[in-house]
Design a protein with these regions (language model features):
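Charge-rich, low-hydrophobicity low-complexity segments
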Residues: 1-12, 17, 51, 145, ...
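Concave beta-strand-loop units of leucine-rich repeat
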Residues: 22-28, 38-49, 58-69, 78-89, ...
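Short linear motifs in low-complexity, proline-biased tails and propeptides
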Residues: 290-296
Length: 305
């Protein structure tokens, strides 16, 4: 039976029995020894621990979900994921470095430290955080869905996807580069910035955006269904699927290249430009197109029905 206050020797014995992990989830343990080093993961989910010891080092992941812990030690080091979801944590220490994902969902944290480093995902959904520090760097995905953040910081770098669904954010920074997907469904954004580069998918469904910038680059799929887009820029290059279903687009631009399917179902488009290039199928069900030029480059099939 575990004691409520573990010694280093007791912790080391438990870790030796569990391949380096220390699993105290839902346990009655109330304190950990100073200077504790966990070579694997430290699981404290739903435990009785109210404070972390000084000098705590976790080589793997640290799970503090549903704990009463309010503060993290200044010298905390986490090699992989840090889960604070639904914990009582009120603030983050300066110089906090998280090698993997940082989940702050459903916490009372109101701000992030200026020098925060997150190597994986940063989850801020359902938090009270209203602003992000300048030059924030997120190695993978940044989730802001249903957060109170109204503005993106200068120098923001997102290596993966940026999720702004149903946020109050009204504008994006010029030359914003998103390595993964950019989700804007239901957001307040009305215009896309110059120099926007999206390595993955771009979704503008249920937004008030009416046009796309001339230099827009989308590496994978572009979803425009249920958007207010009326016109596409000349020379638009979409690496994957271009979804124009039920949009207000009535004309395709010259130089349009679509690497995947081009979906014109339910649109007012009547003609296909001679230089259109499609990597896969051309979907024309319920469209106004009656003729496709013979020299149109189509890698797949033309589907009328």
């Amino acid at each position: 039976m575990l004691s409520t206050k573990l010694s280093l020797a007791e912790c080391e014995k438990l870790m030796a029995e569990d391949h380096g992990d220390l699993n105290l989830s839902r346990s009655k343990v109330t304190s950990l020894p100073t200077g504790l080093t966990v070579k694997g993961d430290l699981h404290l989910w739903g435990s009785k621990i109210e404070e972390l010891p000084k000098g705590l080092t976790v080589a793997g992941s640290l799970d503090l979900g549903y704990t009463e812990i309010e503060y993290l030690p200044d010298d905390l080091s986490v090699g992989s994921d840090l889960n604070l979801h639904s914990s009582k944590i009120k603030s983050l220490p300066k110089r906090l470095s998280v090698g993997g994902d940082l989940n702050l969902g459903n916490t009372e944290i109101k701000s992030l430290p200026d020098d925060l480093f997150v190597g994986g995902d940063l989850v801020l959904s359902y938090t009270a955080i209203k602003s992000l520090p300048d030059n924030l760097s997120v190695g993978k995905n940044l989730y802001l869905q249903d957060s109170e953040i109204k503005k993106l910081p200068r120098g923001l770098n997102v290596g993966g996807s940026l999720d702004l669904q149903w946020t109050e954010i009204e504008s994006l920074l010029d030359d914003l580069s998103v390595g993964g997907n950019l989700y804007l469904q239901g957001s307040k954004i009305k215009k896309l910035p110059k120099g926007l580069t999206v390595g993955g998918d771009l979704s503008l469904s249920r937004t008030e955006i009416e046009s796309l910038p001339d230099d827009l680059s989308v590496g994978k799929n572009l979803y425009l269904q249920d958007s207010e887009i009326k016109k596409l820029p000349r020379g638009l290059n979409v690496g994957g699927y271009l979804d124009l279903r039920d949009t207000k687009v009535k004309e395709l631009p010259n130089g349009l290249h679509v690497g995947g399917d081009l979906d014109l179902r339910g649109t007012g488009v009547e003609s296909i430009p001679d230089d259109l290039s499609i990597g896969c199928d051309l979907l024309l069900q319920d469209s106004h197109v009656s003729l496709v030029p013979n020299d149109t480059s189509i890698g797949g099939e033309i589907k009328w029905n």
